[in-house]
Amino acid sequence: MKFLIIVLCLSLVNGYGIKRNVQEHDLKDPHEHPTMTWEILERFVGNTLYITTPQVLSLPLGAEVRCDDIEGFSCSWPGYKDYAHDHIDFHFNPSNPFYSFVDTFYVSLGDRVDKIYLRVISATSREKMLNVGCHTSFSVNLPIGIQIYHDKDMKLLVEGRHLECAHRVYFVKYCPYHAHGYCFDDKLKVYDLKRIKSRKAFEKVSQHQKSEL
């Protein structure tokens, strides 16, 4: 399938002919922004839209943002929707930690098999989140709901978020609401930067951590 890389921003989408849907002025809820039509959506079928910043994707009634199942577990899009009389506003916030674990979604076009693919570039990648460098003991900044364990069998839970600054591998479990029962298991790697003076030293530590797993 041929993918067209498109950064989804209002100026670009408007450049593809999006019409402005201006409703009656309401000081409490001014509702004026570019909206997609079925005709415009047709141009993107089979392609991928990349979302890199907080965006509102306005779709006609009947179109939905969905995600595929995760190993048999249903998955739902984590954003929120605003309904208008002729369209739905889908609000994307790449800082949502769910996007660090699930970043691929699609726009379903009613009963059609055709899709428009969406790729959300998370504000913090999963790799960056789970590889931490330090100089002193620290409180690790992980999303609410992630549990940290000392052992790979996930029996010995780390109390709180405060960790020692030492070359160490922890094990994490994340069971987000929108994965509907599915849990992501991964590893949190901590590097004591005071002891890493070169790239060679870093690679040696990384290799040692892999051997421990």
Swiss-Prot record:
Keywords attached to this entry: Signal
Superkingdom, taxonomy of origin: Viruses
Name of the molecule in the record: Non-structural protein 7b
Annotated InterPro entries: Corona_6B_7B
A Pfam family this chain is assigned to: Corona_6B_7B
The keyword Signal is annotated on this UniProt entry: yes
First and last residue of the signal peptide: 1-15
